[in-house]
Structure formats: C-alpha cells, structure tokens
Design a protein with these regions (language model features):
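A solvent-exposed interaction/effector surface
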Residues: 1-161
Length: 161
C-alpha cells in the first residue's frame, strides 16, 4: 500500500519546455529537456528537482500536453526553447515510488492512489496539473530505490483548519 503525504510548495520560478506528444515519445523528450536545461544553466546548480507536469493524458491515443520544468533563479532568462513562468505557492498530496513502481503500467496505481486519496478529494479544484517530481536519474538506480513523487496539487482549504 502506498503512503500518501502532503507538503507545501512555495511559489517558484520555473524553466519550462512544453510539448504535445504521445507516450512513446516521452523518454526522448525528457532527455532533450534535461540537456537543454543543463546547457542553459551552464554548470549552475538547479534550485529544485526536475519535474514532468501532465496538462492532459499522455498515452498511445492522447498527446498531453506534457511540460518539463526545473526551478531556476531570477537571473535565468527565457530562450527560443525555454519558457519561464512562476508557479503559485500551493499544497500538494504525493506518494514516493520506487523505480519498479515507476515502470508502466505499475505507475498507474500510484496516480490512482494519490488522485483518490481523501486529501485530494477534500481539496479538489486546484488549477495546477498532476506531476512527477524526480528524486533520482532512472539509469542511475536499481528497481528498489526511490525515483520520484507522484503529486497532485490541492485546492484551497475549506472549513476550519
């Protein structure tokens, strides 16, 4: 059983590359986005984890869109390939999964667990999209090591705190 937690994510400035693509194109897009971000930062360390934001369904029939993001400092400028946007502060519900759980179709269970959790149901209505927040590089870890968080931004709290 997956453990669902919540956390606060402060407002942050993000480098962004967004593309409409199908599931079979995701790995190449991720490699390209990571390389473009690294080249643009020119050796400077990112200030947050690499994330994939799913603005729509990405599978064999649907093409997203999918957005690769990386938190950046205020001095990073947009380019032809990289947009810059500010994401509002928000709370999110998440579960952390291993590389084995990350493989398709096992990853769908993690998405379902978070999406159907009491936290997400009670605070639905966020305008932000679900995401994968990466903790490790897939090629650098074994199947039993943690790879990413599956996260759903939460809507505003209602009722007493």
């Amino acid at each position: 059983m997956l453990t669902i937690q919540t956390r606060h994510v402060p407002a942050r400035r993000l480098m962004s590359i967004q593309r409409r693509l199908r599931a079979s194109e995701t790995d190449a897009f991720v490699r390209e986005a990571k390389n473009v971000f690294a080249e643009h930062l020119r050796g400077a360390a990112p200030i947050g984890p690499f994330s994939l934001v799913f603005h729509g369904v990405v599978d064999h029939d649907s093409d997203g869109p999918l957005e690769a993001t990386l938190a950046c400092s205020d001095d990073v400028e947009p380019t032809e390939l990289i947009g810059i946007r500010t994401e509002a502060a928000h709370d999110e519900a998440f579960t952390t999964i291993t590389k084995a759980q990350w493989e398709y179709p096992a990853i769908l269970a993690a998405y379902d667990a978070v999406a159907c959790s009491p936290e997400v149901i009670a605070r639905s209505g966020s305008r932000l999209s679900c995401r994968e927040v990466y903790l490790a590089e897939p090629d650098a870890i074994t199947d039993d090591e943690l790879i990413c968080d599956i996260a759903y931004p939460l809507g505003e709290r209602t009722g007493p705190r």
